[in-house]
Amino acid sequence: MTENRVVLALLILCIVGFEPSFIHGATDSSDTSALNIMFSSMNSPGQLSQWTASGGDPCGQNWKGITCSGSRVTQIKLPSLGLSGSLGFMLDKLTSVTEFDMSNNNLGGDLPYQLPPNLERLNLANNQFTGSAQYSISMMAPLKYLNLAHNQLKQLAIDFTKLTSLSILDLSSNAFIGSLPNTCSSLTSAKSIYLQNNQFSGTIDILATLPLENLNIANNRFTGWIPDSLKGINLQKDGNLLNSGPAPPPPPGTPPISKSSPTPKSGNRGNRSNGDSSNSKDSSKSGLGAGGVAGIVISLIVVTAVIAFFLIKRKRSKRSSSTDIEKTDNNINQPIILASNDFHQENKSVQNPPLVETKKLDTSLSMNLRPPPSERHKSFDDDDSTMRKPIVAKKAAVVVPSNVNTYTVSDLQVATNSFSVDNLLGEGTFGRVYRAQFEDGKVLAVKKIDSSALPTDTADDFTEIVSKIAHLDHENVTKLDGYCSEHGQHLVVYEFHRNGSLHDFLHLAEEESKPLIWNPRVKIALGTARALEYLHEVCSPSIVHKNIKSANILLDSELNPHLSDSGLASFLPTANELLNQNDEGYSAPETSMSGQYSLKSDVYSFGVVMLELLTGRKPFDSTRSRSEQSLVRWATPQLHDIDALGKMVDPALKGLYPVKSLSRFADVIALCVQPEPEFRPPMSEVVQALVVLVQRANMSKRTVGVGSGSSGVNDYM
């Protein structure tokens, strides 16, 4: 009995002794889930042997790089481990994490929108992150240290208003563009800021009031003068267009700033008068002699006369112009028609009221001479608001059609697994496209508009673009499903086509897969031509696509073509510049020289796509011999030579095509790729030529191979 009691007592002691440790090691379920997803998003790296993709106990099992307090994760430190992939989409659940260090790895993609919200230290330096510095950083009020250096970030979407505790900010060696945000003035604890090796522009005046000790702005595009307050700190400024001399004098009429006394405010006139009175005993101290007084009196008389002259002139001009304003009032208000949902008519309603604008400019010039009396100010505002009314109404009229869905960044991150590489469908001129699968099973394609394509951070501008694209309605134009405009990010959501792009079919398909036979190629050419005909000749005003290429022709399950990016390049402000930088062999000669696009340049690009369908070759292929690298230069001389034409046909067709159909197809190509734009046909004529070709092909009963007799393989007709 005694022995049994001893054993029982020992068991109880063991249980009591181990229970606190067990409870201490149980990790909060939200923290565990966030780390599970983070592990999967980083491609389940072997370097993190204790980590798992589901379940586990990060605190109790001492996962590598994880520090806990109780059941909550408080620190994540995984620097210099060669980690790749992305960071997942549930980091915002880590509400107790105060330090997050993933520096010196190979992590890429966009920074996750959801980051731990209560961080004091965030270090993501020396990775491969792209896109923008996420807005969620703006909410981290406790943040003291932020390092995003040596990545490929382009847009600074951070609002610094709440980051009053931030002491060290390092954004160096990225691709940031534009001016520093005005909210930088809120960085009242900033000691060191590193902005070197970016493309920032504008002035650095916004940093003048900060308590900085170190500032590195080298190798940017800053202009203007260096504030005096920054000249006494550790400042590195080489590689800019800054003026290190004294700042220019203030504009005329601006009171000089005295170092000995602050600039008097509007309520200090009495004190100022007293000061002058007290100093009147010694005119040498006051600095105001009899000549100065006389000058001021004369100046006041002149200014009064000028004001009176303009008041009289303005009254007369108002009487004489009242009739004109009434006559033009209908034209001014006419842009309100833009509220109509008819995309094909919206731009026709825009009017230019030059007479009214001129009068508005004249009166505004007279206003700048002096503060007007209150009753006159009210009268002028009434007139001015009448003239401004059309502009305000026009902007307010931009409404996205009700059939277009609105998504949040969080929605799209979940659907794309935080825009993972596994869901990347392709990367084009204006951004990357991802496959998105939603909870209801629906699959869509999400295009993230690159900040360089839409540099303005104005949601209204993007909404206007979306509204215009949403009105495009044609069976061969990819349909817009929805959009997202949130925290400086702009995304468009399109219908998804499982067969991918024509480019993939022609150039990336595996040899054992079924090749694209002749009739589907003609069908794809005809459908794409009809899409362009719609944009060019049905839409009003006409829409120049600007980006016709095989990668933008998507194929559904029946190989029907759908032209993507329709209207996008036409409405984006920087499209021409971006397209010229990314020419892939589709650009017309005049576009390559001038950088300008037209309906006829679209026709040329379509001809290049037809050449791809005919030959199976890329528009430009550097792996081929120099004489064959440019598809147009190599193929054009052979289009009217039957023997040569047969030899340049895509070998994947294995000679199974109608010779007459092939010849007529080549004739259409030759017309489209004419060097002179005036000789290229309109798309309606191209459509008619291809319709006739398809009709004749369907009537044909045999297929002829190159250098062989007839064949009875009717499937290729």
UniProtKB/Swiss-Prot annotation:
Any one GO molecular function term: protein kinase activity
Pfam families from the UniProt entry: LRR_1, LRR_8, LRRNT_2, PK_Tyr_Ser-Thr
Glycan-linked positions: 271
Domain of life of the organism encoding this protein: Eukaryota
Residues in the Cytoplasmic compartment per record: 313-717
Signal sequence annotation: 1-25
Annotated residues for binding of ATP: 425-433, 447
Positions of the UniProt region annotated as Disordered: 237-287, 365-385
Covalent S-S links between cysteines: none
Extracellular-side positions: 26-291
Compartment annotation: Membrane
UniProt entry keywords in alphabetical sequence: ATP-binding, Glycoprotein, Leucine-rich repeat, Membrane, Nucleotide-binding, Phosphoprotein, Receptor, Repeat, Signal, Transmembrane, Transmembrane helix
Tissue expression: Expressed in seedlings, roots, stems, leaves, flowers and siliques.
Residue intervals passing through the bilayer: 292-312
Gene3D superfamilies: Phosphorylase Kinase, domain 1, Ribonuclease Inhibitor, Transferase(Phosphotransferase) domain 1
Residues annotated as domain Protein kinase: 419-693
InterPro entries attached to this UniProt entry: Kinase-like_dom_sf (IPR011009), Leu-rich_rpt (IPR001611), LRR_dom_sf (IPR032675), LRR_N_plant-typ (IPR013210), PRK1-6/SRF4-like (IPR046959), Prot_kinase_dom (IPR000719), Protein_kinase_ATP_BS (IPR017441), Ser-Thr/Tyr_kinase_cat_dom (IPR001245)
Membrane topology (UniProt): Single-pass membrane protein
GO-annotated cellular components: plasma membrane
Family as reported in the entry's similarity comment: Belongs to the protein kinase superfamily. Ser/Thr protein kinase family.
Note in the entry: Cannot functionally replace STRUBBELIG.
Protein name, UniProt field: Protein STRUBBELIG-RECEPTOR FAMILY 7
Organism of origin: Arabidopsis thaliana (Mouse-ear cress)
